[in-house]
Amino acid sequence: MSLNIETKKVAVEEISAAIANAQTLVVAEYRGISVSSMTELRANARKEGVYLRVLKNTLARRAVQGTSFVELADQMVGPLVYAASEDAVAAAKVLHQFAKKDDKIVVKAGSYNGEVMNAAQVAELASIPSREELLSKLLFVMQAPVSGFARGLAALAEKKAGEEAA
């Protein structure tokens, strides 16, 4: 399907706007993937706040010009799906987890803070907990001493009340 020049310009602007605020851009090759699998991948990406798009590589190369992802342009060959996210690990995590389930998706490369990553580095990035997970762990660690102190006071008060009643 051939796109006219105006449609291509609009697509490049839309993609540029979507990746302008992204910290991470990950590209994965797909060959022979079923429609249901692609729909599931899109749903997972949407749930995690990841911009996921299949598009022509020439349009993707134009969209990354002037961004921190310009170094990734060399990797844009073949049938690719592009995932971008403001969360540093979300795009890598979505594609990596889906690639584990479906061998027709193969993570090729990624870029984080202007650094190009190979598939192994993207897998490492995907293994890092998300910001929300890290914040919840930090909150739990900070809350544990306080809740322990509160339980200790409650037990002491209960013990005193039991002694006074006897």
Curated annotation (Swiss-Prot):
The keyword Disulfide bond does not apply. The keyword RNA-binding applies. PROSITE patterns: RIBOSOMAL_L10. InterPro entries: Ribosomal_uL10, Ribosomal_uL10-like_sf, Ribosomal_uL10_bac, Ribosomal_uL10_bac_type, Ribosomal_uL10_CS_bac. One of its GO terms (biological process) is translation. GO terms for molecular function: large ribosomal subunit rRNA binding; structural constituent of ribosome. GO terms for cellular component: large ribosomal subunit. Keywords: Ribonucleoprotein, Ribosomal protein, RNA-binding, rRNA-binding. Belongs to the universal ribosomal protein uL10 family. NCBIfam families: PRK00099.1-1 (NF000955). Part of the ribosomal stalk of the 50S ribosomal subunit. The N-terminus interacts with L11 and the large rRNA to form the base of the stalk. The C-terminus forms an elongated spine to which L12 dimers bind in a sequential fashion forming a multimeric L10(L12)X complex. Forms part of the ribosomal stalk, playing a central role in the interaction of the ribosome with GTP-bound translation factors. This is Large ribosomal subunit protein uL10.
